[in-house]
Amino acid sequence: MKVQVAPKKQLTGKIEPFDSFWEAPEDIERGYATFGQFYEHNYLKYIPQDRQSRILVISCGPGYFVNLLTRKGYSAVLGIDSYPSKVAYATSRGLNCVVAHAFDFLQETNTPFDVIFVEQEINHLTKDEILIFLRLCWENLRDGGTLLMHSLNGANPITGAEALAQNFDHYNTFTEYSLRQVLEYCNFQDIKVIPLNLYVFYTNPLNYVAMALHKVNTLIFRFNFKLYGKFNRIFTKKIAAICRKSQGKVAGVIEAGHHRFDGRR
């Protein structure tokens, strides 16, 4: 049975709704190169090698990730975004993108995907909406299918609090622990939470300075967190999760033993 969700107008985000992409630069054309490099470095290794894999890109915007996958030879990629102007930019480049609201699309489609990639931060959804969204993703993945999504990192002492406050439609942040926690609750498995590396533009000398400073900050942050009994390890501005749909379970039903105290709370 499909999860019943509220129509799009009842979702909480209004100014920058979740089912559109809001991170594109003013020079949209330039974003195909910069975001393409960022996505290739951080995500491409987690996409199945089979070029026939059915891949859904949610909140695709002008099609940055769709463009990367298409260039890499993937032939069954579909991008959806709720803003027609952004989709028009993608289709003008010959990319397979359509106008659709994410929740409605996931509720209505009947053909499962091998991969669902969420291009917009999930922080644009409330906690209740995130649970519904994850259940919808679950229902639209094949057994063993892969979900990739990302979030603002609340563990970063410099950007964590500001990231929550700087956008009216940011409703939460996550840490490595809480991102894993909600995916376990929705019965995803093989969960891997990774830092998203911003410093992937290796032709820019300042990139290496930023990488070095980030490593120093990470050591300082880890030391100070341990002073308070915390064991956070990831302090990048954003984090991502890669997980798989487990077989023989029901979405949203947590199994005994998943909750545990391990000092991260």
Give residue spans per PLM region.
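A C-terminal cap/extension of S-adenosyl-L-methionine-dependent methyltransferases
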Residues: C97, L148, Q181, K192-R265
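Short alpha-helix
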Residues: Y171-N187
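A short His-aromatic
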Residues: N123-L125
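Short, glycine-/aromatic-enriched active-site segment of Class I SAM-dependent methyltransferases
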Residues: M149-N172
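Short glycine-dipeptide loop
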Residues: L141-L147
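Hydrophobic/aromatic residues located in beta-strands of well-ordered beta-sheets
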Residues: V77, L147-M149
